[in-house]
Amino acid sequence: VTAKGADNYTAKIRVQATNGISYFEIYNADIKTGAKGSLIEGTGKSFDSQTEYTEEFHMTGLTDNKCIRVSVTDTEGTVIERNLLVKITPSVLFSETVNIETADDYYGSYYATWLNGRVYLRSNGEQYVPEIDFSMGMIDGIPSLISPAQRSQYNLPTFDGLKDTKFELTTLTITEYNNISKVNAEPISTLTDPTLSNIGISANKVYLFKTADGKKGLIAITSMTKRTGTIETANGEWVKDTEYYRVVITTKVIA
């Protein structure tokens, strides 16, 4: 495990073979499955029956976890392989791609950055009040990011205890957002804190948010689709053919 924000790691590898070492190689490996990948250039070495070998393998420019497979072949042709997984300690937490709605229909309109990004309906969100960071809704027909604590001001369904959150549109492009790595929070931390309790949203834009408890991050709007459904109002009535938006987002949050 690397130090927080570190983008390099040196693995100290020591191998022994009673029958003598013939070949030593290091391969890339899949960080999730551990499956063996391509041979890393310059790591293949052959020996004349020596029984021990030590190498320091330097990994630099790390922006995500890194897995390697060390392969040793002895003089009798026996191959022994072991994986080494280097886990970075991120400065920025990435979410998965999720669907969120401007009204509670199928996915929900409340978002929490924990657990790689979670979306909740009002019906199941009350048990996660401390985790909910922002919400979405329709304000005067405009799909918007809305401070969870301010939903009642816009006549939107809500529940008690939700936190206050501020928003701002950034000048970042989606490409610039995608280029923010897990080991460098500076592109987020240096942005001026947001001040708006709600803001209309558009596809392919990047928004800044900061919660009352200090969590600061970015929201990238990948796509927006207009839909209709039977939607509950703030007074508990259900209205057919109500227009709302289904929005695809990811978030990147300072750890």
Predicted features and spans:
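Surface-exposed, short loops/turns at beta-strand junctions within beta-sandwich domains
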Residues: 49-51, 58-65
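Short, low-complexity, Pro/Ser/Thr/Gly-rich segments in the mature regions of secreted, periplasmic
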Residues: 240-255
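Structural beta-strand segments of beta-rich domains
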Residues: 7-13
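Exposed beta-strand face motif in extracellular beta-rich ectodomains
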Residues: 9, 22, 64-68, 217
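Acidic, glycine-rich flexible loop segments
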Residues: 176-236, 254
